[in-house]
Regions:
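Alpha-helical elements of the RecA-like P-loop NTPase motor core of helicases
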Residues: 12, 22, 90, 136-140
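Aromatic- and histidine-enriched alpha-helix N-cap/loop-to-helix transition segments
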Residues: 37-43, 103-107
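A general alpha-helix detector
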Residues: 10, 44-48, 91
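Short glycine/serine- and small hydrophobic-enriched flexible loop segments
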Residues: 47-54, 113-117
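Active-site neighborhoods of divalent-metal-dependent phosphate/nucleic-acid chemistry enzymes
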Residues: 76-134
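Helix-adjacent hinge/juxtasegments
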Residues: 51-83
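Short, well-structured N-terminal submotif of metal-dependent ribonuclease cores
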Residues: 1-41, 52-65, 144-145
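Extended low-complexity acidic/polar segments
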Residues: 2, 7, 98, 109, ...
Length: 147
């Protein structure tokens, strides 16, 4: 199984005080599941980690260290994918026009779509993880399992 984690799910896996933080974290640590996320997740996660430190909830350096360990290309369990900007923007624009989805949510869906096309084996289950109900609805329409 290949699982794309939207940035909301990735962030939740590091912020243990957030509801549902165990599920994405368990997915990332499961050696039998290929977990992936888009390159913008690095920016969104870092932003969330900084805000969590500013509110006194967590220490930024600890969150960042865990995230960097998980996304380390040499041995991390969360693959950060870089997709073609032109391709992802075309798909994201279509999603925004058709569904009115927020821009970054559309970008994440488009990135997941391109990632599944490139990395999923034939007949391999493709799953999507998000906290956003509208994004989840579209992912389901596209045939992705929701976790």
């Amino acid at each position: 199984m290949i699982v794309y984690l939207d940035s909301s799910a990735v962030v939740r896996s590091y912020l243990a005080d957030e509801a549902g933080s165990a599920s994405p974290s368990d997915l990332i640590r499961d050696p039998d599941i290929t977990t992936v996320t888009g390159s913008w997740t690095r920016i969104e996660a870092t932003s969330a980690f900084v805000r969590a430190e500013r509110t006194g909830r967590f220490v930024f350096a600890e969150l960042e260290a865990a995230f960097l360990r998980d996304t380390d290309p040499a041995g991390g369990n969360l693959l950060v994918v870089d997709v073609s900007q032109a391709e992802v923007e075309l798909i994201a624009l279509r999603v925004v026009r058709e569904h009115g989805l927020r821009a970054m949510d559309a970008w994440q869906l488009a990135c997941a779509h391109l990632t599944f096309e490139a990395l999923a084996e034939p007949h391999e289950q493709a799953a999507f993880v998000t906290r956003d109900a509208e994004q989840a609805r579209i992912a389901r329409e596209w045939g992705y399992l929701l976790i």
